[in-house]
Amino acid sequence: MKRVHVIDSHTAGEPTRLVMEGMPALSGRTIAEKCDDFRDNHDAWRRAIMLEPRGHDVLVGALYCAPESSDASCGVIFFNNSGYLGMCGHGTIGLVASLHHLGQLTPGCHKIDTPAGPVSATLHDDGAVTVRNVLSYRHRRRVPVEVPGYGTVHGDIAWGGNWFFLVSDHDMTLELDNVEALTDYTWAIRQALEAQSITGENGGVIDHIELFCDDREADSRNFVLCPGKAYDRSPCGTGTSAKLACLAADGKLAPGQVWTQASICGSRFEAFYEREGDGIRPSIKGRAYLSADATLLIDERDPFAWGIASP
């Protein structure tokens, strides 16, 4: 019987499962190299932790790792039901809240190593967390893609720790009761991007699709389709970072000016940025709440010990 110690939380509605113990040791000097080893040699563990019957398609995993740099508090590898993430904003907030629960982090600023590079996270006295994300930038503006059944869709391609296609010009209603139609629309966009070989810089796969509309209580509301075809319940930290990169490139948001991003569920992140080189350094503020401190059991006799995978 294998045992995996996890801490579950949610950040603005989006769940994170922090894996503390029970995983095989990963080889590699950097967090990116450890992520490669996880992907190439231990992916069954991702499936066991993320897929049914222990997980679900909305869940994001965060593997706690020793840091690669001497001044970092820890390292982390993010993953979900379909694969691995370079960075995850809501997951970093969940990581910090969970480590605080375990007594491993105190209020203050902490450096965290991720596959996409180092980030810093400030745990505030009231429990909120501000993540200073990786360098973010817009790669291309108003890119047309022909989407079967929907016509030509224009969107910006931007990096916020993952690759995003950001669409503001659309006829969709961003409400919870319209999630099925929103999922169909954004999935069709993602498939069209792949079919037409539209990518991020250096061929990076655009695996997040983000729609925007006006919101009465925030600067914007979004709907984010994640790589595994689930939608983000939170406003999406890396997606908000990509949005800020586009706003900055268009001269619509000044450095230090706060942008309030609402999710499809109504939860909110506060964000601002600093200019850095040809891009920006975004900061995202949100809050996570703990939901479980548990031990997952993996019984080798169980036919679904390593998850129920789609064919």
Curated annotation (Swiss-Prot):
Catalytic reaction list: trans-4-hydroxy-L-proline = cis-4-hydroxy-D-proline
Stored SUPFAM superfamilies: Diaminopimelate epimerase-like
EC nos: 5.1.1.8
Active site: C88, C236
Residues binding substrate, per UniProt: G89, H90, H208, D232, G237, T238
Keywords of the record: Isomerase
Domain of life the protein comes from: Bacteria
GO molecular function list: 4-hydroxyproline epimerase activity
Any Pfam family: Pro_racemase
Keyword Isomerase recorded: yes
InterPro entries reported for this sequence: Pro_racemase_fam
Function statement: Catalyzes the epimerization of trans-4-hydroxy-L-proline (t4LHyp) to cis-4-hydroxy-D-proline (c4DHyp). Is likely involved in a degradation pathway that converts t4LHyp to alpha-ketoglutarate. Displays no proline racemase activity.
Similarity annotation: Belongs to the proline racemase family.
Annotated protein name in UniProt: 4-hydroxyproline 2-epimerase
Natural source organism: Chromohalobacter salexigens (strain ATCC BAA-138 / DSM 3043 / CIP 106854 / NCIMB 13768 / 1H11)
